[in-house]
């Protein structure tokens, strides 16, 4: 966790300033592109809001209501990316839910902003009901072009480095990233360390 900041620093300081002569131009473009994509969501920075290419919020719940990260008023926000048909998600989401319910029962003020990463609305709704996560803010970017093909509203997958699921980000009350790409077991551990230091 947090090694992406080292990667971005190395790219900005050495690679794109032509101090790495062993890297060919094709590879350099790939490295620089990746660093540019993940730089906005490094630990300690405010999590990127889900805005479309025109700067408008676009993540909608199952009823079509738009939601944003900033609307959440809690000491902590768990940002969860999951795929309803992902086998690993089917196992991990109930564990995440149990962990959060335990934290909430001890008085921790935490809310969940859960992003479905797939384009099948029926599967997404079924997953929410089956996994009993209806108390989370469940949103998705389910849009299709005129021919019925899935279309993303923004580059949020790149910004949040979502190439597999589930992925968890822990945010503070100001939506700054405390931790990212953590396991469900680390949620309580990290919050415990923070709460213990207050």
Predicted features and spans:
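Extended hydrophobic-aromatic, low-complexity segments
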Residues: 79, 87-92, 122-125, 178-181
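A structural signal for short secondary-structure junctions
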Residues: 72-73, 105-108, 129-132, 160-164
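Short loop/turn microsegments at loop-to-beta-strand junctions
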Residues: 46-48, 77, 165-166
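Short acidic-hydrophobic, aromatic-tinged amphipathic segments that line or gate anion-handling sites
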Residues: 138-142, 181
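Oxidative protein folding and maturation machinery
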Residues: 1-65
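Structural microenvironment flanking redox-active thiols in thiol-disulfide oxidoreductases
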Residues: 90-131, 147-153
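Thiol/disulfide oxidoreductase modules built on the thioredoxin-like
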Residues: 146-192
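Short active-site neighborhood of thiol/selenol oxidoreductases, capturing the structured segment around
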Residues: 65-96, 111-113
């Amino acid at each position: 966790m947090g090694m992406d900041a080292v990667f971005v620093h190395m790219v900005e300081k050495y690679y794109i300033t032509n101090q790495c002569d062993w890297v060919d131009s094709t590879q350099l473009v790939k490295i620089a592109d990746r660093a540019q994509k993940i730089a906005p969501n490094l630990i300690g920075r405010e999590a990127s809001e889900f805005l479309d290419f025109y700067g408008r919020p676009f993540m909608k719940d199952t009823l079509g209501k738009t939601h944003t990260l900033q609307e959440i008023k809690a000491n902590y926000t768990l940002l969860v990316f999951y795929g309803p048909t992902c086998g690993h998600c089917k196992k991990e989401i109930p564990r995440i839910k149990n962990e959060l319910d335990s934290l909430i029962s001890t008085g921790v003020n935490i809310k969940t902003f859960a992003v479905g990463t797939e384009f099948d609305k029926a599967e997404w709704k079924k997953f929410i009901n089956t996994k009993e996560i209806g108390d989370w803010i469940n949103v998705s970017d389910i849009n299709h072009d005129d021919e019925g093909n899935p279309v993303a509203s923004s580059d949020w997958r790149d910004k949040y480095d979502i190439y597999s699921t589930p992925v968890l980000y822990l945010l503070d009350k100001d939506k700054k990233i405390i931790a990212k790409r953590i396991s469900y077991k680390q949620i309580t551990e990290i919050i415990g360390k923070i709460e213990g230091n207050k």
